[in-house]
């Protein structure tokens, strides 16, 4: 289960990158449908997540990250595997 610190940092990054209020960034929120991200927003957000958490997210994996929870789970999995 992702730590509260990881979740808080991810929410902060998403809020900054997408210009949305952190209160809207819930685990079930979908980046494109609920948070109005376009493809450029998603690329920039993924790059920021990679830098913040020290993980690499290949394009084929990034395409599967649909919700905030998907992002949390993916990053946690990458950190545990390292």
UniProtKB/Swiss-Prot annotation:
Residues 4-79 form the Carrier domain. 4'-phosphopantetheine is transferred from CoA to a specific serine of apo-ACP by AcpS. This modification is essential for activity because fatty acids are bound in thioester linkage to the sulfhydryl of the prosthetic group. SUPFAM superfamilies: ACP-like. It is found in: Cytoplasm. The modification O-(pantetheine 4'-phosphoryl)serine is found at residue 39. One of its GO terms (molecular function) is acyl carrier activity. Signal peptide: none annotated. Keywords: Cytoplasm, Fatty acid biosynthesis, Fatty acid metabolism, Lipid biosynthesis, Lipid metabolism, Phosphopantetheine, Phosphoprotein. GO terms for cellular component: cytoplasm. Pathway: Lipid metabolism; fatty acid biosynthesis. The keyword Phosphoprotein applies. InterPro entries: ACP, ACP-like_sf, PP-bd_ACP, Ppantetheine_attach_site. The keyword Acetylation does not apply. Belongs to the acyl carrier protein (ACP) family. NCBIfam families: acyl_carrier, PRK00982.1-2, PRK00982.1-4, PRK00982.1-5. Carrier of the growing fatty acid chain in fatty acid biosynthesis. HAMAP family: Acyl_carrier. This is Acyl carrier protein. The lineage of its organism: Bacteria, Bacillati, Chloroflexota, Chloroflexia, Chloroflexales.
């Amino acid at each position: 289960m992702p730590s509260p610190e990881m979740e808080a940092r991810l929410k902060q990054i998403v809020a900054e990158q997408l210009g949305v209020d952190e209160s809207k960034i819930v685990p079930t929120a979908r980046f494109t449908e609920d948070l109005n991200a376009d493809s450029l927003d998603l690329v920039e957000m993924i790059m920021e997540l990679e830098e913040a958490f020290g993980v690499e997210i290949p394009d084929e994996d990034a395409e599967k990250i649909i919700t905030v929870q998907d992002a949390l789970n993916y990053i946690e999995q990458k950190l545990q595997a390292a």
